[in-house]
């Protein structure tokens, strides 16, 4: 019988948290509050399992660049060497199924997918439009040293929350105060081709349509006591909420 690989997530957490501490950054761990707006968004957004509760990134921080713009940083750790990111056939972070439903298995299993999920919570429920989602995994070499692997993704209103890989990094020193402005410039240089943008936009519109279909069915089943006009008004309110959240 093959020997199962043991998760080293606690070691990954120790390593990365030690980096953040050495950079003298004010980072917060899972259940620690960061910012009222961010904390509420993580609480209100659907969880990685699809239910109610709270979304808890392994680490989170809020950094400011030279233009006084704030960037939430959301970090997720996984303890297996093959659990950094799961992408679809278009090379996008695969957080939706073929039926345009949340891909909870990927969101739960892969570090970047989880971090991008958290970032979308902020896009939907806060005033922040530019978020950095970071996934970190790793493995031990034959001497017991941790060899980390890092995925850094830009999740923004400009890319409709899809997430774009920024670059390859071996640590998180780009978050240090003296390096952060250069990192922001690098992030801002990213763009989607018109074809990529249109494809993602169509996917987002399909997600909204699927959500509204489900909403309509739920209203019909759960609010049969309402008059037709009441049901229409309730549905319209949800349409506007969804459209606003998606930035259309």
Question: Model features per residue range: what roles?
Answer:
Residues 1-132, 137-151, 159-160:
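A short, conserved, highly charged catalytic patch centered on acidic carboxylates
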Residues 7-8, 176, 227:
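Alpha-helix initiation/capping motif
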Residues 6, 24, 31, 64, ...:
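Residue-identity detector for glutamine
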Residues 44-65, 162-200:
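Long, acidic, intrinsically disordered low-complexity segments
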Residues 179-248:
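Non-catalytic nucleic-acid substrate-recognition regions in nucleic-acid-modifying enzymes
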């Amino acid at each position: 019988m093959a020997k199962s690989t043991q998760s080293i997530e606690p070691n990954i957490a120790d390593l990365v948290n030690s980096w953040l501490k050495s950079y003298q950054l004010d980072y917060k761990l899972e259940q620690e509050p960061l910012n009222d707006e961010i904390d509420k968004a993580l609480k209100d957004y659907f969880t990685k399992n699809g239910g109610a509760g709270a979304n808890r990134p392994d680490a989170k921080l809020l950094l400011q660049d030279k233009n006084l713009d704030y960037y939430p940083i959301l970090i997720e750790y996984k303890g297996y060497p093959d659990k950094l990111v799961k992408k679809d056939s278009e090379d996008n972070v695969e957080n939706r199924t073929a039926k345009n439903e949340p891909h909870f298995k990927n969101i739960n299993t892969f570090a970047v997918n989880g971090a991008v999920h958290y970032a979308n919570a902020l896009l939907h429920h806060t005033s922040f439009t530019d978020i950095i989602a970071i996934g970190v995994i790793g493995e031990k070499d034959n001497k017991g040293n941790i060899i980390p692997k890092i995925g850094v993704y830009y999740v923004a209103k400009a890319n409709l929350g899809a997430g774009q890989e920024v670059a390859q990094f071996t640590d998180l020193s780009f978050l240090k105060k003296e390096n952060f402005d250069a990192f922001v410039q690098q992030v801002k240089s990213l763009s989607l081709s018109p074809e990529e943008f249109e494809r993602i936009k169509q996917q987002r519109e399909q997600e909204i349509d699927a959500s509204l279909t489900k909403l309509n069915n739920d209203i019909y089943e759960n609010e049969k006591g309402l008059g037709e006009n009441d049901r229409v008004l309730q549905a319209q309110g949800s349409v506007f909420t969804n459209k606003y959240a998606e930035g259309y």
